[in-house]
Regions:
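N-terminal loops that bind phosphate or other acidic moieties
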Residues: 1-198
């Protein structure tokens, strides 16, 4: 499970983990999860994924809406939503988010699918979000809504629609640069400069 994966990584000495996924159709499942948990319409959160035509997008939105209505997911708890319309990828990523909190390892979220999993985790165990670092804000319309709901705001705005952990890995480089600046930059007192006051 995702929780066990994080535990294993902790035991091996890892201090930071990235999420990512690979698959076809998983923006459909993440849209359904998002719409259910945020109680919004399918059309508000369902985008083109890997590049659907207008006809394909309309069909995808209909599929999401039908699932929400058929299983009355707007009134369901997070676990029911996950088991009804979330895929194995979203379940595993949800476990990683929970595992990050359990084992005190920050988890760098990739895109919209990871963020949908993060919202499930936060709804199941409030406070999990404190261990999550969002990497990029993708092209899917659910991305902004998920960031707002989680109060986690991605720093990379590159209109990516890739998945597979690409945004999360890019975030590692930014984190390395930030840590380098933090660790190697001189302080005002070290260079005898009066500190700015606001």
């Amino acid at each position: 499970t995702g929780i066990e994966l994080v535990q294993d990584c902790k035991e091996k000495g890892y201090g930071l983990l990235a999420t990512g996924e690979m698959g076809i159709g998983n923006t459909t499942t993440s849209s359904a999860v998002t719409a259910a948990l945020l109680q919004c319409e399918a059309e508000e959160v369902t985008g083109r994924g890997a590049g659907l035509t207008d006809q394909g997008l309309t069909r995808k939105q209909q599929v999401v809406r039908t699932a929400l209505e058929t299983y009355d997911l707007w009134h369901a708890d997070a676990f029911t939503v996950l088991q009804t319309v979330g895929g194995l990828d979203i379940a595993g990523l949800t476990g990683m988010c929970i595992g990050g909190a359990l084992w005190h390892i920050p988890i760098v979220l990739d895109g919209v699918i990871s963020m949908a999993a993060a919202l499930v985790a936060e709804r199941l165990f409030p406070g999990v979000r404190e261990y999550l670092l969002p990497s990029h804000l993708g092209k899917e319309p659910a991305a902004v809504k998920l960031a707002d709901a989680l109060r986690l705001f991605p720093v990379i705005h590159a209109e990516m629609a890739l998945g597979e952990g690409t945004g999360a890995v890019m975030m590692f480089t930014l984190l390395d640069m930030a840590m380098s600046i933090y660790g190697q930059s001189a302080t005002f007192s070290e260079i005898a400069v009066e500190q700015y006051k606001r």
